[in-house]
Amino acid sequence: MKESHFFAHLARMKLIQRWPLMRSVSPENVSEHSLQVAFVAHALALIKNKKFGGTLNPERIALLAMYHDSSEVLTGDLPTPVKYYNPEIAKEYKKIEAAAEHKLLSMLPEEFQEDFAPFLLSHSSHEEDSQIVKQADSICAYLKCLEELSAGNHEFALAKKRLDVTLQERKTPEMEYFLNTFAPSFELSLDEIS
């Protein structure tokens, strides 16, 4: 049996800092972020199913969200302003991400690659599932901005404005429900939510 370095690589998600160009009151790594995105994506799928007639699989979507940034163990976390500086850079970076996804998948024993492919290869997942994960990813970035701003860190003011626009562009009934129901608490202190 051949050794696999797959999970050793995934364990390094905790070493990759998000928001690398920003001063943060509370630093965040890719592992923490992925778990929060999984929580939110799962909730968005449940909200869509229960409130807006969806037929999604919330558990599959949560799993997809857990792995959504896993290729960053090979690429690092490129800051959003750099990644989307212009369409050419964004297009080339997508190619780099795809190559990293395939490299990560190839680290698994062959008998498990088919099982992991839908979660590791961004082009393999259902479009609707991917959209929910993208929505959750944007919401989590927005919530991070709320937390930082609430702690007095104005470094995140511009990022929040940018995310206000992104959330408006991606707006769905389930996102609106989530944001109205859960987001205000992120601006409160522990005493206020206890």
From Swiss-Prot:
The keyword Nucleotide-binding applies. GO terms for molecular function: 5'-deoxynucleotidase activity; metal ion binding; nucleotide binding. Its main location: cytoplasm. It is found in: Cytoplasm. Residues 30-142 form the HD domain. Keywords: Cytoplasm, Hydrolase, Metal-binding, Nucleotide-binding. The keyword Nucleus does not apply. The record marks R18 as: Appears to be important in orienting the phosphate for catalysis. It catalyses: a 2'-deoxyribonucleoside 5'-phosphate + H2O = a 2'-deoxyribonucleoside + phosphate. SUPFAM superfamilies: HD-domain/PDEase-like. Pfam families: YfbR-like. Its EC number is 3.1.3.89. One of its GO terms (cellular component) is cytoplasm. It is an enzyme of class 3 (hydrolase). Its cofactor is a divalent metal cation. SMART domains: HDc. A divalent metal cation binds at H33, H68, D69, D137. Substrate binds at R18, W19, H33, D69, D77, L78, P79, T80, D137. Homodimer. Belongs to the 5DNU family. Catalyzes the strictly specific dephosphorylation of 2'-deoxyribonucleoside 5'-monophosphates. This is 5'-deoxynucleotidase VP0926.
